[in-house]
Amino acid sequence: MTSPQKAILAGGCFWGMQDLIRKQPGVIATRVGYSGGDVANATYRNHGTHAEAVEIIFDPQATDYRTLLEFFFQIHDPTTPNRQGNDRGTSYRSAIYYLDDEQKRVALDTIADVEASGLWPGKVVTEVSPAGDFWEAEPEHQDYLQRYPSGYTCHFIRPGWKLPRRATAGQ
């Protein structure tokens, strides 16, 4: 049996990100928190330069990192710096926090495909950085939209959105 793998993604308010990602095939568990910033023991009221992020545990036999990233780019706008919908500020930036060189390679390759696809109107501004500490958010933020199904979100699945792979040299 293959061990579960982890991904850490930020794409705006973590409530909507978690709610959609948790429903994807192969996702075992999710939790929301703060990552990519400068404050130890980050909290909602004091998270410094951290982004609101989702930690995803997934079964690599049921899904892969690339598939998770494709979904990530479908449910948030990666072309708006420090913003998703009405949410503004560095907390709401688009970011991929990779855990190893392979995740970094897949992230950069997926971003190149997003850029080449023209599915988004502008240049992708998604930050790609090594994963640092992930500070779990307070209990009231975990599984928020499961507890409050009509709660706030600015994330949605875009029907018919399919990321093509770009043609690369040597194919």
Swiss-Prot record:
**Record has Oxidoreductase as a keyword:** yes
Q: Which GO terms describe its biological process?
A: protein modification process
Which InterPro entries does this chain map to?
Met_Sox_Rdtase_MsrA_dom, Met_Sox_Rdtase_MsrA_sf
EC number of this enzyme: 1.8.4.11
Q: Which GO terms describe its molecular function?
A: L-methionine:thioredoxin-disulfide S-oxidoreductase activity; peptide-methionine (S)-S-oxide reductase activity
Q: Which NCBIfam families match?
A: msrA
Q: What name has this protein been given in UniProt?
A: Peptide methionine sulfoxide reductase MsrA
The gene that this protein is the product of is msrA
